[in-house]
Amino acid sequence: MILYEYPFNERIRTLLRLEDLFERFAFFLAQEDPREHHVALTTLFEIAEVTGRADLKSDLMKELERQRQTLAPFRGNPGIEQNALEAVLGEIEQTLANLAQMQGKTGQHLVDNEWLASIRSRAVIPGGTCKFDLPSYYAWQQWPAEQRRQDIAKWILPMLPLRDAAAIVLRLARESGQASKVMAMQGSYQQMLSGRSYQLMQVRVPPELRVIPEASANKYMLWVRFTMQDGDVRPRAVDIDVPFHLTLCNL
């Protein structure tokens, strides 16, 4: 099944963006070629843009504290797997401690590093990091892969508590959902939400159908419409019945 996820609010949208960026960063950092490490570095700059929001850290700390207070009373409950509970609570508490230790504005260390700041300013220009534009950056790219990797890992380090916090919040949200098998009649599906507040919607579709879900929702109703794309033309609405799995997640 192919999984599509749709956030119901700006906070979850931001966390999904962060998750995607950190996954891309980790993939390219693990590679060997200087061009792949260039992608890792430019992705690091994107992460700094997203995490630079003034309220992101405080939002994550509030949510983790709320989850800790929700889960802590289940300690000693015979109906709850205690080892799993303690593992989650320990992870939350450690991440809260790491967030509390973060000093200053997120990503400020990148701004304060003049060399990185020069690369960052050139990276937004198409072709702006050629060897004649940034000879010192080109020289750095000729260093051994492991040395480049260590440098980039050092630069991402101050932002890792935010990655860990986002991962916990998204995991708890995803685990809260119950999947149901539904049918989009003639490619369209609607469901009343009765005012219930959800954080995230997951749509899983069989890959062989080659359909693409488009979703929208408010506090009263959600709507999923399926489209199909032929080559490089704009996707078109389908008029066939589409079976899929729908999961609504709420922290």
From Swiss-Prot:
UniProt GO cellular component terms: cell division site; cytoplasm
Location(s) in or outside the cell: Cytoplasm
Gene Ontology BP terms: division septum assembly; FtsZ-dependent cytokinesis
Main location (coarse class): cytoplasm
Gene3D superfamilies the record matches: YacF-like, YacF-like domains
Keywords per UniProt: Cell cycle, Cell division, Cytoplasm, Septation
Domain of life, source organism: Bacteria
Pfam family, one: ZapD
PANTHER family in alphabetical order: CELL DIVISION PROTEIN ZAPD (PTHR39455:SF1)
Its biological purpose: Cell division factor that enhances FtsZ-ring assembly. Directly interacts with FtsZ and promotes bundling of FtsZ protofilaments, with a reduction in FtsZ GTPase activity.
Quaternary structure and interacting proteins, as annotated: Interacts with FtsZ.
Family: Belongs to the ZapD family.
Protein name: Cell division protein ZapD
Protein source organism: Burkholderia orbicola (strain MC0-3)
Taxonomic placement: Bacteria, Pseudomonadati, Pseudomonadota, Betaproteobacteria, Burkholderiales
Name of the gene this protein is made from: zapD
